[in-house]
Swiss-Prot record:
Belongs to the class-III pyridoxal-phosphate-dependent aminotransferase family. ArgD subfamily. The lineage of its organism: Bacteria, Pseudomonadati, Pseudomonadota, Gammaproteobacteria, Pseudomonadales. Keywords: Amino-acid biosynthesis, Aminotransferase, Arginine biosynthesis, Arginine metabolism, Cytoplasm, Pyridoxal phosphate, Transferase. It is an enzyme of class 2 (transferase). The modification N6-(pyridoxal phosphate)lysine is found at residue 255. It comes from Pseudomonas aeruginosa (strain ATCC 15692 / DSM 22644 / CIP 104116 / JCM 14847 / LMG 12228 / 1C / PRS 101 / PAO1). This is Succinylornithine transaminase/acetylornithine aminotransferase.
Length: 406
């Protein structure tokens, strides 16, 4: 019999953890579907989804089953060997997308790191060492490793860690003329989020992505889509590129891919993938049997008309109610996004106060996010039911009313 867990409290974070986070005052201890309970037993409705991660809510039966069954078989073998869940997952991702090859990692940052390394390696092998420059959008977010944080182009994340990486240029998002002016035959890749998440939940314009694809083709550059947040059903298609009809050369996935279990994936073509030959890149835990089994189960549930069509319908339910709240209280001037990745942009009077909205919402037992100090973000479970949406938005409206009225 195992010993009982020692009691911990929020203050223990400040005592023992590196202070790079500022977590909420309460500690979630249990979740079921779109509801979470804290240490005191208080129940909250989850519109945050672990930052667009818990795509099927908490403790989804299919994911619990996959994890517990795999846990009784084998946990880890390293990439000296392969394993059955990883191969099944890779095959299903290939069957469902443009891709012909898959690299499995542990996170979105790792998937992006692999994507950026592959883009440079491919260009080096095919065109020569002078073709290494990467163009990305300003206010992007691609991860926290030194390479990915430099590609992201947000000084608040990249400053203070030594010299910035050379060969990385940032241009305004959705500005095709700026991209056209920046790209050259030295460009190895253009890296874009189909929807900027941390940048404020900004969807790409159709002409922008189409133009980026054309420019990449003209300059023999690879088009890389970071779909860590927008992928795996989040927008009502399995991946956002399918909504736009613009096919990338490399795509990164994570977050919803594991439904709450850590996993990332880089998807690409066979012609490009062959340039990551044996020993050029790797990961000890990437594609481990536990993570792969859970991700396979998540993919099976998400990639169905019932779930994907439901995401589109739920978007309209959220949007219409949030627009009414914005008009009633004068706090939001735009509701934007796609599917169940939604941003409520604050009015001039409330700009910079997204954290205040989050804190007010928590007091009314609903969990939301921010996507900058000016935007409140919603990224709930893809299978949240209408009753929970309505109840959660009622709580959210109470929070907004109290905040606005002081």
């Amino acid at each position: 019999m195992s010993a009982p867990h020692a009691q911990v409290e929020r203050a223990d974070f400040d005592r023992y953890m590196v202070p790079n986070y500022a977590p909420a005052a309460f500690i979630p201890v249990r979740g079921e579907g779109s509801r979470v309970w804290d240490q005191s037993g208080r129940e909250l409705i989850d519109f945050a989804g672990g930052i667009a991660v818990t795509s099927l809510g908490h403790a989804h039966p299919a994911l619990v089953k996959a994890l517990t069954e795999q846990a009784q078989r084998i946990w880890h073998v390293s990439n000296v060997f392969t394993n059955e869940p990883a191969l099944r997952l890779a095959r299903k991702l290939v069957d469902a997308t443009f891709a012909e090859r898959v690299f499995l990692a542990n996170s979105g940052a790792e998937a992006n790191e692999a994507a950026f390394k592959l883009a440079r390696r491919y260009a080096n092998d095919v065109y020569g060492p002078q073709k290494y420059e990467i163009i990305a959008a300003s206010n992007s977010f691609h991860g926290r490793t030194l390479f990915t944080v430099n590609v992201g182009g947000q000084p608040k994340y990249s400053d203070g860690f030594g010299p910035k990486f050379e060969g990385i240029t940032h241009v305004p998002y959705n500005d095709l003329e700026a991209l056209k002016a920046a790209i050259s035959d030295k460009t190895c890749a253009v890296v874009l989020e189909p929807i900027q998440g941390e940048g404020g939940v900004l969807p790409a314009q159709q002409a922008y992505l189409e133009g980026a694809r054309k420019l990449c083709d003209e300059h023999n550059a690879l088009l890389v889509f970071d779909e860590v947040q927008s992928g795996m059903g989040r927008v009502g298609e399995l991946f956002a590129y399918m909504h736009y009809g613009v096919v990338p050369d490399i795509l990164s996935s994570a977050k919803s891919l594991g439904g709450g279990f850590p996993i990332g994936a880089m998807l690409t073509t066979g012609e490009i993938a062959k340039h990551l030959s044996v020993g050029t890149h790797g990961t000890t835990y990437g594609g481990n049997p536990l993570a792969s089994a859970v991700a396979e189960a998540a993919l099976d549930v998400i990639n169905t008309p019932e779930v994907l069509d439901g995401v589109k319908a739920k978007h309209e339910r959220f949007k219409s109610r949030l627009q009414k709240i914005g008009q009633e209280y004068g706090i939001f001037d735009e509701i934007r996004g796609m599917g169940l990745l939604i941003g409520a942009a604050l009015t001039d009077e409330w700009k910079g106060k997204a954290r205040d909205v989050l804190n007010a919402a928590e007091k009314e037992a609903v969990m939301v996010l921010q996507a900058s100090p000016d935007v409140v973000r919603f990224a709930p479970s893809l299978v949240i039911d209408d009753a929970e949406i309505d109840e959660g938005l009622e709580r959210f409206e109470r929070a907004v009313a109290k905040l606005v009225r002081g």
